[in-house]
Amino acid sequence: MTSGDERIKAKKEFILQGFTAKTHCEAIARLFDVPGIQRVIVSVAFVNRSGTELLKHQLKKYAAKTKAFIGIRNDITSTQGAKHLLDLGVSLLLVDTGSRSVLFHPKLYLAKGAEHARLVIGSANFTMGGLNNNIEAGFAIELDLKNSDEKALVEGIEKEFDALTKDYPDHVIPITKAAELDALQATGRLIDEMTTSPPRPASAATSP
């Protein structure tokens, strides 16, 4: 017989940004409605200032509980975006694979409370395009931590990300000062939004 605990099912919402009125920005903002937030994890390939501006109020309120894993050495993540996260008080970890041909690319946003958690996972980076303008797909999932399977899922996510710094100390870089970001920009691992044009997708008309 299945217990009442096990009958509870996670609520899932599909987000098809660009073709519907739903956006990842709105879905991620709702993560912060979880009662009694204890922890927030953000993991993305790319971040820029226009992206962080969209969620700055939520991030500032829960900065002390937020850990952000951000990919670098990808010609998109900017010094300005990373500095904004640092200024907001977020615990910032930059992930450098050491190669431009192998990117840190997971896109995941998690807020965990005492009894509930919310998760957004899909294709959306922490940029204006990823959160609002691009055609993106993802799932927003509400999880009940009284359900053993859903609790295990959330704890598994936490465990995997918590292990990154210990398991890959040469590639996961904790940032505590703006000067560290300036040094990464100087070596080409972060871009300067003031001097770098946004990437343009190749097309039949523009490709050599």
Task: Name every feature range the model reports, one short phrase each.
Residues 1-208:
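PLD/PLD-like phosphodiesterase catalytic module centered on the HKD motif
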